[in-house]
């Protein structure tokens, strides 16, 4: 039985949060957003991280805002927040009480200090990324067979990635383009390829094997 929806804000571009939350409300489901790419993304009502029951953010070194390593879980529910705080601190409730199995998931002082410094510059970083994204989009629009995602309306991206679609009308394949870019020092990525379900430890699992996800396989490839 389905208990929750786990949507992904991908490439710094938000999901259709209003439609997802309508589905969740109708079916009495929790919504847990994979917001690894979404720090600094805004929608019509403010930060995209305010949506859902939880938003899980990555602060890995590759992200627009980072602490080299780390992340955060955003929750509007006080009880959930306290529970997460206990989990990341060995399950401690107070100095003398442990009431659940926890982990050492606390952020180090060094990583936290780095994050505080980065916060001072995040608006400037996103503005610069937008300028680069706008330039790419204007120039790539002149090339037949290359498609950019384009505007996301009143939503505000953090421009963390610049995805393109290589169409059949382009003179070479996506993989050949990838190789040529790499030879010229441009390190593009086939981001979600291969799927996790194609990895050896999962591939033969009847519940999670790749044959159960034909649409995801088609999109990723």
PLM segments and residue spans:
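PLP-dependent aminotransferase class I/II
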Residues: 4-8, 13, 17-19, 26, ...
């Amino acid at each position: 039985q389905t208990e929750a929806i786990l949507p992904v804000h991908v490439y710094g571009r938000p999901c259709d949060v209003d439609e997802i939350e309508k589905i969740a409300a109708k079916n009495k489901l929790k919504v847990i957003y994979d917001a690894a790419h979404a720090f600094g993304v805004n929608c019509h009502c403010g930060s995209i991280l305010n949506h859902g029951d939880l938003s899980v953010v990555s602060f890995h070194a590759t992200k627009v805002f980072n602490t080299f390593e780390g992340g955060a879980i955003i929750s509007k529910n006080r009880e959930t927040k306290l529970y997460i705080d206990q989990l990341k601190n060995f399950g401690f409730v107070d100095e003398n009480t442990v009431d659940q199995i926890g982990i050492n998931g606390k952020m180090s002082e060094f990583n936290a200090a780095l994050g505080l410094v980065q916060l001072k510059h995040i608006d400037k970083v996103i503005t610069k990324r937008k300028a680069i994204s706008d330039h790419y989009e204007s120039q790539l629009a002149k090339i037949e067979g290359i498609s950019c995602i384009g505007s996301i309306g009143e939503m505000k991206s953090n421009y963390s990635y610049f995805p393109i679609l290589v169409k059949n009308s382009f003179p070479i394949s996506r993989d050949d383009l990838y190789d040529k870019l790499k030879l010229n020092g441009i390190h593009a990525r086939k981001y979600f390829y291969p799927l996790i379900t194609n990895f050896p430890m999962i591939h033969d699992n009847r519940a999670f094997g790749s044959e159960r996800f034909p649409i995801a396989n088609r999109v990723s490839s």
